[in-house]
């Protein structure tokens, strides 16, 4: 007999246990069996010993399932993108938060000093009656954004200028004035510009001394028109913009005459990115932030109006006014009693411009660019000076401040302004609404003694005939023309024959003269 005895038959209970265990050991597509899962689950319960094991049994089982999930390397899973609404709410959340004690301090300061913060809710209500709906929710958010601007900068005046739309985003524009002597950014910008100009001049001089330059071109570019100083002309106000309420306010740089002149020749939709390049013809000298500032200056000069008599020139300023000088300041009239709404709608003579007109030169005050320094005059020749004196430009003159709207030029056959009542059903409480047809999106809403200017549009001027880019300039002469390089024209056959006959006659006459002289000499010898 062998040692390996044949096992006897199993007990029925043990056999059922084996069958049950083999059933639990069956695996699915993931390679995991129920036996292994229950073993791991029971081991975790015994190790953690939660007080409510029955209640957390299902949650622990689900956690084990999720922990075993393995994502294949060949499966691409796109990350979950945050919605635009969530991003916008995250940006605007800071507007509605208030630190401990900040509210009480701001209220106490508001009682002591007047705040430059405008009442935007009142403005939105006034505009809504005039048919320009800014929206109550957006008005609240913009008001909170303006409050943040006034809290972080020493402002004397803050005004909501409007909203410029763009293809990829819009701009909220705030028009501000700093307290006297507290605009440090403007002074720093001016110093940097002066340093840059000095460095450029030094580099040019060094390059000229170091290298033998080829002959200089006789072409002289037009003189650079200087920009107006901060606080005057087109740079009278400072502008801040942000992409949406809650975003950071960005200060726009001062505008230059070259940028205004170029903006008049192009049409470009804003993208919502201040650093985006402006690719147009004619080329624009700057990026979108400069184009935005130029368009704001143009829109303000053409659409900011007020009822006649609301503003007046100062008495002291009128006495000291020099002949030919341009008035650029005014003050509110304390004796203004208001103009009835019906009269504001009937005649445009009851409205005036209270922002200076921008001349074709790109400035509000004309500057003579033909006046040159003594060094430049010494270098130039007398003939060139005489030519320049003959071609001296004529001064540009625009309409003065507080000019009535009735003197505005028409756009083809379209009037520049349209005035109407906000409602004809209840005329006693109606408002006067003035809409600009030259700059679509510019509105002025006025009651008897109160008015508001706002612009909500694409920043494009109306052109009835459509836009066509200007033609390129005429090609310049490659070299100066003169008799030294001018080719003579070939003579005709008749001219050649006449010249030949004239030469033959001259030769015959010369021979006769020689013969006569020879005969006279022979006679004298005899």
From Swiss-Prot:
Compartment list: Cytoplasm, Cytoskeleton, Flagellum axoneme
Intrachain S-S bonds: none
Domain of life per record: Eukaryota
Compositional bias annotation for Acidic residues: 181-212, 374-395, 507-526
Region of interest called Disordered, as start-end residue ranges on this chain: 180-231, 371-411, 469-526
One Gene Ontology biological process: cilium movement involved in cell motility
InterPro entries: Radial_spoke
UniProt KW Transport keyword: no
A cellular component term, taken from the record's GO annotations: motile cilium
Segments of skewed composition (Basic and acidic residues): 497-506
Major localization listed first in the record, in broad terms: cytoplasm
Keywords: Cell projection, Cilium, Cytoplasm, Cytoskeleton, Flagellum
UniProt similarity note: Belongs to the flagellar radial spoke RSP4/6 family.
Function: Functions as part of radial spoke complexes in the axoneme of sperm flagella that play an important part in motility. The triple radial spokes (RS1, RS2 and RS3) are required to modulate beating of the sperm flagellum.
PANTHER family in UniProt: RADIAL SPOKE HEAD 6 HOMOLOG A, RADIAL SPOKEHEAD-RELATED
Assembly: Component of sperm axonemal radial spoke complexes.
Listed name of the protein: Radial spoke head protein 6 homolog A
Source species: Xenopus tropicalis
Gene that encodes the chain: rsph6a
């Amino acid at each position: 007999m062998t040692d390996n005895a044949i096992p006897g038959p199993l007990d029925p209970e043990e056999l059922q246990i084996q069958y049950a265990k083999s059933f639990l050991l069956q695996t699915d597509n993931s390679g995991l069996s129920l036996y292994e899962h229950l073993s791991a689950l029971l081991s975790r319960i015994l190790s953690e010993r939660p007080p409510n094991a029955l209640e957390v049994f299902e949650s622990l089982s689900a956690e084990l399932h999720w922990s075993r999930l393995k994502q294949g390397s060949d499966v691409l899973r796109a990350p979950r993108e945050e919605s635009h609404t969530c991003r916008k709410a995250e940006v605007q959340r800071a507007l509605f938060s208030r630190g401990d004690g900040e509210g009480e301090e701001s209220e106490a300061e508001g009682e002591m000093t007047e705040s430059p913060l405008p009442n935007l809710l009142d403005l939105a209500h006034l505009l809504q009656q005039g048919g320009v709906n800014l929206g109550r929710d957006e008005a609240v958010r913009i008001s909170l954004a303006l409050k943040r601007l006034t809290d972080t900068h020493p402002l004397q005046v803050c005004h909501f200028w409007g909203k410029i739309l763009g293809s990829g985003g819009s701009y909220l524009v705030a028009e501000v004035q700093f307290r006297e002597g507290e605009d440090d950014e403007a002074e720093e910008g001016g110093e940097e510009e002066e340093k840059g100009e000095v460095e450029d001049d030094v580099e040019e001089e060094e390059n000229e001394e170091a290298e033998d330059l080829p002959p200089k071109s006789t072409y002289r570019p037009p003189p650079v028109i200087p920009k107006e100083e901060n606080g005057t002309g087109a740079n009278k106000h400072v502008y801040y913009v942000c992409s949406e309420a809650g975003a950071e306010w960005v200060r726009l740089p001062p505008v230059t005459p070259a940028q205004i002149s170029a903006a008049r020749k192009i049409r470009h939709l804003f993208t919502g990115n201040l650093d985006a390049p402006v690719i147009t013809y004619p080329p624009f000298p700057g990026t979108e932030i400069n184009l935005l500032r130029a368009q704001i200056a143009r829109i303000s000069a053409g659409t900011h109006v007020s009822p006649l008599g609301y503003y007046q020139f100062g008495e002291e300023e009128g006495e000291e006014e020099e002949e030919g000088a341009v008035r650029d300041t005014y003050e509110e009239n304390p004796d203004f009693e208001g103009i009835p709404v019906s009269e504001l709608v009937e005649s445009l003579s009851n409205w005036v411009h209270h922002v200076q007109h921008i001349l074709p030169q790109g400035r509000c005050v004309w500057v003579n660019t033909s006046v040159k320094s003594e060094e430049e005059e010494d270098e130039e020749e007398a003939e060139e000076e005489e030519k320049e004196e003959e071609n001296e430009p004529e001064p540009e003159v625009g309409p003065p401040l507080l000019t009535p709207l009735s003197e505005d030029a028409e756009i083809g056959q379209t009037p520049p302004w349209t005035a109407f009542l906000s409602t004809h059903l209840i005329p006693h409480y109606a408002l006067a609404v003035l809409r600009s047809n030259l700059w679509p999106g510019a509105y002025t809403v006025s009651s008897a003694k109160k008015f508001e200017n706002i612009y909500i549009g694409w920043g494009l001027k109306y052109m009835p005939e459509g836009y066509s880019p200007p033609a390129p300039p005429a090609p310049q002469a490659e070299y100066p023309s003169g008799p030294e390089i001018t080719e003579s024209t070939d003579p005709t056959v008749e001219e050649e024959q006449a010249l030949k006959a004239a030469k033959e006659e001259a030769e015959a006459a010369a021979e006769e003269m020689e013969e006569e002289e020879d005969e006279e000499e022979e006679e004298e010898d005899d």
